[in-house]
């Protein structure tokens, strides 16, 4: 019998963490984070990391496992996540994977071998030099010439991802977007119940804007300064939305006002990209907050549906 696993996805600021904690309490589950930035230590405010009081009540995995100056990739996540799924399942508990990093989620819910294309250090160094000498826009133009579909999906400031896409194209002769299309193959090694949360776009965007203001009030800039001391501008960790803009401000490249504006703008764009990504998976059971009076209604419906799925009552 296939092991069962609950997955909760959706854009930033929609309530994924809240729903995961609600379900975990009532199902005696453990939670696996699928957030590419919550893996980093000390990056708490900017990643909306689960508060310690909740982590003490419910076991959370794959949070605070990497130093900010270290690199971490999706293949490493996949391997660790599978380990945790097996570990939690061995205790007769249901794992709950929650996060908004589409590639991390798909590495588990879909079939794709990430080690099929190895890195080329020489090529990577050449591409990094192009970025340093001519800027991210020039590097992004190279990707646009060879793989327009990937260029459309990957922001030019996500240098690490742009380089990887170019690298795959040049090493394999195939477009990076074509390889990603293999995500159409679902992973049937596990029995997944995937919940997708969404909301009215304007309401979601207003919540995101408010969240940025709250981050600043909670001491986000002090957090950034602390991380800044142990990283450099090429560190993978500070490519995250919020941190990237903060470091531009700390390096006197933009004003504080422009930093706030960019953080909000880029967070909204990211939420839009997240929805576009997740909508490709037809297995997702979508719950739109605008269709319910209270979030508690969504919690109760999800709990009911999950229990029916767990015990095969439908």
From Swiss-Prot:
Coiled coil: none
Annotated EC: 2.5.1.75
Class of the enzyme per the UniProt entry, highest EC level: transferase
Residues that, per the record, bind substrate: 12-17
Gene3D superfamilies: 1.10.20.140, P-loop containing nucleotide triphosphate hydrolases (3.40.50.300)
Keyword field: ATP-binding, Magnesium, Nucleotide-binding, Transferase, tRNA processing
Required co-factors: Mg(2+)
Listed InterPro entries: Dimethylallyltransferase (IPR039657), IPT (IPR018022), P-loop_NTPase (IPR027417)
UniProt GO molecular function: ATP binding; tRNA dimethylallyltransferase activity
A GO biological-process term: tRNA modification
Catalytic activity reported: adenosine(37) in tRNA + dimethylallyl diphosphate = N(6)-dimethylallyladenosine(37) in tRNA + diphosphate
Site (Interaction with substrate tRNA): 101, 124
Binding residue positions for ATP: 10-17
Family: Belongs to the IPP transferase family.
Entry function: Catalyzes the transfer of a dimethylallyl group onto the adenine at position 37 in tRNAs that read codons beginning with uridine, leading to the formation of N6-(dimethylallyl)adenosine (i(6)A).
Subunit structure: Monomer.
Protein name, per record: tRNA dimethylallyltransferase
Originating gene: miaA
């Amino acid at each position: 019998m296939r092991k069962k696993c609950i997955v909760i996805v959706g854009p930033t600021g929609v309530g994924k963490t809240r729903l995961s904690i609600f379900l975990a309490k009532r199902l005696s589950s453990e939670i696996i984070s699928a957030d590419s930035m919550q893996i980093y230590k000390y990056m708490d405010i900017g990643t909306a990391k689960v508060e310690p009081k909740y982590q003490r009540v419910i076991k959370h995995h794959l949070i605070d496992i990497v130093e900010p100056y270290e690199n971490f990739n999706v293949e490493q996540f996949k391997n660790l996540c599978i380990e945790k799924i097996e570990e939690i399942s061995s205790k007769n508990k249901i794992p709950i994977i929650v996060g908004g990093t589409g590639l991390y989620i798909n590495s588990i819910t879909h079939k794709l071998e990430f080690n099929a294309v190895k890195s080329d250090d020489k090529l990577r160094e050449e591409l990094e030099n192009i970025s340093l000498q001519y800027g991210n826009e020039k590097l992004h133009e190279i990707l646009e010439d060879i793989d327009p579909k990937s260029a459309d999906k990957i922001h030019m400031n996500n240098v690490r991802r742009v380089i990887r896409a170019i690298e795959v194209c040049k090493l394999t002769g195939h477009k990076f977007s074509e390889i990603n299309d293999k995500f159409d193959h679902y992973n049937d090694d596990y029995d997944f119940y995937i919940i997708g949360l969404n909301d009215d776009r304007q309401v979601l965007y207003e919540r995101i804007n408010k969240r940025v203001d709250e981050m600043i009030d909670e001491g986000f800039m002090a957090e950034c300064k602390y991380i800044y001391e142990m990283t450099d501008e090429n560190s993978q960790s500070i490519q995250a939305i919020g941190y990237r803009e903060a470091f531009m401000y700390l390096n006197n490249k933009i004003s504080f006002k422009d930093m706030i504006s960019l953080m909000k703008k880029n967070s909204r764009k990211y939420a839009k990209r997240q929805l576009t990504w997740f909508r490709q998976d037809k297995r997702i059971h979508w719950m739109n907050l605008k269709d319910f009076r209270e979030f508690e209604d969504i919690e109760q419906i999800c709990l009911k549906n999950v229990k029916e799925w767990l015990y095969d009552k439908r």
